[in-house]
Amino acid sequence: MVPQTETRAGAGFKAGVKDYRLTYYTPDYVVKDTDILAAFRMTPQPGVPPEECGAAVAAESSTGTWTTVWTDGLTTLDRYKGRCYDIEPVPGEDNQYIAYVAYPIDLFEEGSVTNLFTSIVGNVFGFKALRALRLEDLRIPPAYVKTFQGPPHGIQVERDKLNKYGRGLLGCTIKPKLGLSAKNYGRAVYECLRGGLDFTKDDENVNSQPFMRWRDRFLFVAEATYKAQSETGEIKGHYLNATAATCEEMLKRAQCAKELGVPIIMHDYLTGGFTANTSLSSYCRDHGLLLHIHRAMHAVIDRQRNHGIHFRVLAKALRLSGGDHLHSGTVVGKLEGEREVTLGFVDLMRDDYIEKDRSRGIYFTQDWCSMGGTMPVASGGIHVWHMPALVEIFGDDACLQFGGGTLGHPWGNAPGAVANRVALEACTQARNEGRDLAREGGDVIRSACKWSPELAAACEVWKEIKFEFETIDKL
């Protein structure tokens, strides 16, 4: 018997429950250039065939429900339904499969990450037939990419605004993250920027708390930024966190930052939500502000290998929604991140065209249609000894963010910034001269210590600090 893969309105309505695979599992389907494609890692419940699970995922994330409904006959279901067109077992895993699902582009509102996610990662993740489900990757077709505006400015425009080329950018998250008064906070910002950093940053927790209201912070930070600029002759910035309880309040804070003339603001895009993020990105584009994005809450969603959403999907979604910077992990620091996987989604953030490469976790070729790139931000447990690896891994188009690795310097904040700037420039020069930083990085840092006492002091403090834990999320 040939499975029924098309819904025919003329066949008449027959009430009851039927297998999803009769309608939504279509292995002969030829993918269209306009289809949105998803790769799901499925763990079926015992006794449930993978074809039924794959079809259920396609159905529940598109047009299907648990029973046959008579209103199916009032539309052309074949035009709108998702289709599970391929299933492959996961090597080395029992009862795990990658299900490939194609969605017609007409299922989604133009320019809306919110609507995209509501369908593809909605109720289907609670489906009883599945023990676990993880969205590994999405292909966003050019026809849908072109409905989004993407980052407010992108990497090249940011460099032009800052007038900084040929090296990575340096940042620092002000610590302690909570508890400082606005004036002391501004003092720390000034010292770090004066010492040689390009940016300082609000921690993701910093909004508008009793110990430091947002307007006071904005004013003292703006003063610190302008003072550091006048003394160094370089353009400086501080990521002022505009995240707030409501979109209206968030945009009010963004407007204040614009009126103060600062170059960049910040948003927590997962806790704030994609609707808020897209609104803020549009405001930044219209008013000349760069937008730094923090990924607070991402590990709740992406860290488990079998269930949730891989960060590469969250990174793609952010590029669509809009952000000039996005935290991406470090590979070498205190936070989770395997090298090849991290470099895979870093390329998805920065590059215009990325080929399918399963060795890096990239399931689909992605064409961004000249949409501006998002600069990856490496932060979390890094210090000067990590600089050679960071320059070798991320290259120039990245922001390397040292919080404790700046403010923990034994001589103070400004010497900590000096140490990081010297280390970055030494490693960049060594790389440009053709030296292998992976092999000679330690020698490069030790050589630079001879003419930078600040770097020498930092190297002595952090020479034994390592974060050697096995990565959970591997290919």
UniProtKB/Swiss-Prot annotation:
Main function: RuBisCO catalyzes two reactions: the carboxylation of D-ribulose 1,5-bisphosphate, the primary event in carbon dioxide fixation, as well as the oxidative fragmentation of the pentose substrate in the photorespiration process. Both reactions occur simultaneously and in competition at the same active site.
Residue numbers bearing the N-acetylproline modification: P3
Gene that encodes the chain: rbcL
Binding-site positions, substrate: N123, T173, K177, R295, H327, S379
Record keywords, A-Z: Acetylation, Calvin cycle, Carbon dioxide fixation, Chloroplast, Disulfide bond, Lyase, Magnesium, Metal-binding, Methylation, Monooxygenase, Oxidoreductase, Photorespiration, Photosynthesis, Plastid
Post-translational modification N6,N6,N6-trimethyllysine, affected residues: K14
Family listed: Belongs to the RuBisCO large chain family. Type I subfamily.
Protein name according to UniProt: Ribulose bisphosphate carboxylase large chain
Binding site for Mg(2+): K201, D203, E204
Annotated compartments: Plastid, Chloroplast
Site, as annotated: Transition state stabilizer: K334
Positions carrying N6-carboxylysine: K201
GO biological process terms held by the UniProt record: photorespiration; reductive pentose-phosphate cycle
Molecular functions (GO terms): magnesium ion binding; monooxygenase activity; ribulose-bisphosphate carboxylase activity
HAMAP family: RuBisCO_L_type1 (MF_01338)
Subunit composition and interactions: Heterohexadecamer of 8 large chains and 8 small chains; disulfide-linked. The disulfide link is formed within the large subunit homodimers.
Source organism per UniProt: Tetradesmus obliquus (Green alga)
Positions of the pro-segment in this chain: 1-2
Active-site annotation: K175, H294
Further comment found in the protein's record: The basic functional RuBisCO is composed of a large chain homodimer in a 'head-to-tail' conformation. In form I RuBisCO this homodimer is arranged in a barrel-like tetramer with the small subunits forming a tetrameric 'cap' on each end of the 'barrel'.
Entry EC number(s): 4.1.1.39
Entry cofactors: Mg(2+)
